[in-house]
Regions:
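Charged, low-complexity intrinsically disordered terminal segments
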Residues: 1-203
Length: 203
Protein backbone atom coordinates (compact mmCIF):
# COMPACT_ATOMS: atom_id res chain seq x y z
CA UNK A 1 0.00 0.00 0.00
CA UNK A 2 0.98 3.66 -0.14
CA UNK A 3 1.60 3.52 3.62
CA UNK A 4 4.07 0.65 3.08
CA UNK A 5 2.03 -1.59 5.37
CA UNK A 6 1.77 -5.29 4.79
CA UNK A 7 -1.88 -6.27 4.75
CA UNK A 8 -3.33 -9.69 5.42
CA UNK A 9 -5.64 -10.53 2.52
CA UNK A 10 -6.53 -14.00 3.81
CA UNK A 11 -10.01 -12.95 5.02
CA UNK A 12 -10.86 -11.88 1.47
CA UNK A 13 -9.72 -15.06 -0.24
CA UNK A 14 -12.38 -17.31 -1.69
CA UNK A 15 -12.15 -21.00 -1.00
CA UNK A 16 -12.56 -22.96 -4.22
CA UNK A 17 -14.96 -25.84 -4.19
CA UNK A 18 -15.38 -28.55 -6.79
CA UNK A 19 -18.92 -29.09 -8.01
CA UNK A 20 -20.25 -32.17 -9.75
CA UNK A 21 -21.93 -30.49 -12.69
CA UNK A 22 -21.75 -30.96 -16.47
CA UNK A 23 -21.78 -27.24 -17.20
CA UNK A 24 -20.46 -23.87 -16.16
CA UNK A 25 -21.17 -20.14 -16.16
CA UNK A 26 -18.52 -17.59 -17.21
CA UNK A 27 -19.03 -13.83 -16.82
CA UNK A 28 -16.88 -11.80 -19.20
CA UNK A 29 -16.37 -8.27 -20.42
CA UNK A 30 -15.37 -6.48 -23.59
CA UNK A 31 -13.56 -3.15 -23.81
CA UNK A 32 -12.63 -0.86 -26.71
CA UNK A 33 -9.07 -0.36 -25.44
CA UNK A 34 -7.56 -3.56 -26.82
CA UNK A 35 -7.55 -5.42 -30.12
CA UNK A 36 -9.60 -8.39 -28.89
CA UNK A 37 -13.23 -8.31 -30.02
CA UNK A 38 -14.39 -10.62 -27.24
CA UNK A 39 -18.11 -9.90 -27.56
CA UNK A 40 -18.23 -10.43 -31.31
CA UNK A 41 -15.93 -13.46 -31.19
CA UNK A 42 -18.17 -15.23 -28.68
CA UNK A 43 -21.21 -14.64 -30.90
CA UNK A 44 -19.36 -15.86 -34.00
CA UNK A 45 -18.10 -18.94 -32.15
CA UNK A 46 -21.66 -19.88 -31.19
CA UNK A 47 -22.80 -19.45 -34.80
CA UNK A 48 -19.90 -21.47 -36.19
CA UNK A 49 -20.36 -24.39 -33.78
CA UNK A 50 -24.17 -24.59 -33.86
CA UNK A 51 -25.64 -27.83 -35.19
CA UNK A 52 -29.39 -27.36 -34.86
CA UNK A 53 -30.30 -23.78 -34.01
CA UNK A 54 -29.16 -20.35 -32.92
CA UNK A 55 -31.90 -18.11 -31.57
CA UNK A 56 -31.14 -14.43 -31.09
CA UNK A 57 -32.91 -11.49 -29.50
CA UNK A 58 -31.48 -8.04 -30.09
CA UNK A 59 -32.86 -4.49 -30.14
CA UNK A 60 -30.44 -3.41 -32.87
CA UNK A 61 -29.01 -5.08 -35.97
CA UNK A 62 -26.09 -3.15 -37.43
CA UNK A 63 -23.64 -5.75 -38.68
CA UNK A 64 -20.04 -5.73 -39.80
CA UNK A 65 -18.83 -8.13 -42.48
CA UNK A 66 -17.64 -10.85 -40.10
CA UNK A 67 -20.86 -11.15 -38.15
CA UNK A 68 -23.01 -10.91 -41.27
CA UNK A 69 -20.99 -13.71 -42.87
CA UNK A 70 -21.26 -15.89 -39.75
CA UNK A 71 -25.04 -15.50 -39.65
CA UNK A 72 -25.38 -16.30 -43.35
CA UNK A 73 -22.98 -19.24 -43.23
CA UNK A 74 -24.78 -20.84 -40.28
CA UNK A 75 -28.14 -20.58 -42.04
CA UNK A 76 -26.76 -21.80 -45.36
CA UNK A 77 -25.40 -24.99 -43.77
CA UNK A 78 -28.83 -25.83 -42.38
CA UNK A 79 -28.81 -24.29 -38.91
CA UNK A 80 -32.07 -22.65 -37.83
CA UNK A 81 -30.93 -19.06 -37.32
CA UNK A 82 -33.82 -16.98 -35.99
CA UNK A 83 -33.61 -13.35 -34.90
CA UNK A 84 -36.24 -11.48 -32.88
CA UNK A 85 -36.23 -7.72 -33.44
CA UNK A 86 -38.49 -5.00 -32.02
CA UNK A 87 -41.79 -4.37 -33.72
CA UNK A 88 -41.80 -0.82 -32.36
CA UNK A 89 -38.39 0.91 -32.31
CA UNK A 90 -36.90 3.32 -29.82
CA UNK A 91 -34.69 4.88 -32.52
CA UNK A 92 -36.13 5.04 -36.02
CA UNK A 93 -32.77 5.65 -37.69
CA UNK A 94 -31.29 2.45 -36.22
CA UNK A 95 -34.52 0.60 -37.01
CA UNK A 96 -34.50 1.59 -40.68
CA UNK A 97 -30.80 0.78 -40.87
CA UNK A 98 -31.38 -2.70 -39.43
CA UNK A 99 -33.92 -3.41 -42.14
CA UNK A 100 -31.30 -2.86 -44.85
CA UNK A 101 -29.73 -6.16 -43.74
CA UNK A 102 -33.00 -8.07 -44.01
CA UNK A 103 -32.84 -8.96 -47.74
CA UNK A 104 -29.36 -10.49 -47.49
CA UNK A 105 -30.19 -12.41 -44.32
CA UNK A 106 -33.55 -13.68 -45.59
CA UNK A 107 -32.00 -14.79 -48.88
CA UNK A 108 -29.51 -16.89 -46.90
CA UNK A 109 -32.25 -18.59 -44.91
CA UNK A 110 -32.08 -16.54 -41.72
CA UNK A 111 -35.52 -16.12 -40.15
CA UNK A 112 -36.39 -12.66 -38.84
CA UNK A 113 -39.26 -11.96 -36.46
CA UNK A 114 -40.57 -8.65 -35.16
CA UNK A 115 -42.13 -8.45 -31.71
CA UNK A 116 -45.46 -6.84 -32.52
CA UNK A 117 -46.45 -5.72 -28.97
CA UNK A 118 -43.51 -3.34 -28.77
CA UNK A 119 -39.80 -3.02 -28.09
CA UNK A 120 -37.36 -5.85 -27.38
CA UNK A 121 -34.35 -4.88 -25.29
CA UNK A 122 -32.91 -8.35 -24.56
CA UNK A 123 -29.45 -9.25 -25.85
CA UNK A 124 -29.58 -13.04 -26.05
CA UNK A 125 -27.96 -15.86 -28.00
CA UNK A 126 -29.08 -19.44 -27.29
CA UNK A 127 -27.94 -22.47 -29.27
CA UNK A 128 -28.75 -26.19 -29.33
CA UNK A 129 -30.14 -26.10 -25.76
CA UNK A 130 -26.54 -26.23 -24.58
CA UNK A 131 -25.05 -22.74 -24.89
CA UNK A 132 -26.32 -19.25 -24.27
CA UNK A 133 -25.17 -15.68 -23.78
CA UNK A 134 -27.10 -13.01 -21.90
CA UNK A 135 -25.69 -9.54 -21.37
CA UNK A 136 -25.41 -5.98 -22.59
CA UNK A 137 -23.81 -6.64 -25.98
CA UNK A 138 -25.99 -5.50 -28.87
CA UNK A 139 -25.46 -6.51 -32.47
CA UNK A 140 -24.17 -3.09 -33.48
CA UNK A 141 -20.87 -1.27 -33.86
CA UNK A 142 -21.25 0.68 -30.63
CA UNK A 143 -21.47 -2.44 -28.49
CA UNK A 144 -19.00 -4.52 -30.47
CA UNK A 145 -16.32 -1.86 -30.99
CA UNK A 146 -16.87 1.36 -29.02
CA UNK A 147 -18.47 0.58 -25.64
CA UNK A 148 -17.54 -1.17 -22.42
CA UNK A 149 -19.82 -4.21 -22.27
CA UNK A 150 -20.38 -7.33 -20.20
CA UNK A 151 -22.17 -10.64 -20.60
CA UNK A 152 -22.48 -14.13 -19.17
CA UNK A 153 -21.72 -17.30 -21.11
CA UNK A 154 -23.69 -20.37 -20.01
CA UNK A 155 -22.80 -23.92 -21.02
CA UNK A 156 -24.98 -26.94 -20.27
CA UNK A 157 -26.85 -25.41 -17.34
CA UNK A 158 -30.58 -25.60 -16.64
CA UNK A 159 -30.83 -21.87 -17.33
CA UNK A 160 -30.08 -22.45 -21.02
CA UNK A 161 -33.33 -24.37 -21.46
CA UNK A 162 -35.21 -21.61 -19.65
CA UNK A 163 -33.72 -19.00 -21.98
CA UNK A 164 -34.88 -21.00 -24.99
CA UNK A 165 -38.37 -21.31 -23.49
CA UNK A 166 -38.48 -17.54 -23.08
CA UNK A 167 -37.40 -17.11 -26.70
CA UNK A 168 -40.21 -19.38 -27.88
CA UNK A 169 -42.78 -17.55 -25.75
CA UNK A 170 -41.62 -14.24 -27.20
CA UNK A 171 -41.60 -15.57 -30.76
CA UNK A 172 -45.25 -16.59 -30.36
CA UNK A 173 -46.06 -12.87 -30.18
CA UNK A 174 -44.02 -11.98 -33.25
CA UNK A 175 -44.65 -11.44 -36.93
CA UNK A 176 -42.30 -13.37 -39.20
CA UNK A 177 -40.81 -11.03 -41.78
CA UNK A 178 -41.05 -12.14 -45.40
CA UNK A 179 -39.25 -10.90 -48.49
CA UNK A 180 -42.58 -9.41 -49.56
CA UNK A 181 -42.66 -7.36 -46.36
CA UNK A 182 -39.18 -6.07 -47.16
CA UNK A 183 -40.10 -5.12 -50.73
CA UNK A 184 -43.29 -3.36 -49.63
CA UNK A 185 -41.61 -1.08 -47.10
CA UNK A 186 -42.28 2.63 -47.67
CA UNK A 187 -39.83 4.22 -50.08
CA UNK A 188 -38.72 6.89 -47.59
CA UNK A 189 -37.80 4.20 -45.05
CA UNK A 190 -35.65 2.41 -47.60
CA UNK A 191 -33.88 5.65 -48.51
CA UNK A 192 -33.28 6.63 -44.89
CA UNK A 193 -31.95 3.16 -44.12
CA UNK A 194 -29.48 3.22 -47.00
CA UNK A 195 -28.32 6.74 -46.15
CA UNK A 196 -27.84 5.79 -42.50
CA UNK A 197 -25.80 2.78 -43.54
CA UNK A 198 -23.08 5.17 -44.71
CA UNK A 199 -22.42 6.02 -41.07
CA UNK A 200 -23.20 2.56 -39.66
CA UNK A 201 -19.79 2.21 -37.91
CA UNK A 202 -20.71 5.18 -35.73
CA UNK A 203 -23.99 3.62 -34.59
Amino acid sequence: TYSHETLDVTPYMVEHEAFDTPGFVVPYGDIPLDKDKVGENVYIDILNHARDFVHIMTPYLILDGELLHALKFAAERGVDVSIIMPGIPDKKSAYYLAKTYYPTLLASGVKIYEYTPGFVHAKVFVSDNSRAVVGTINLDYRSLYHHFECATYLYRTSSVVGIEEDFQATMAKCHRVSMTDVKNRPFHQKCLGLLTRLVAPLM
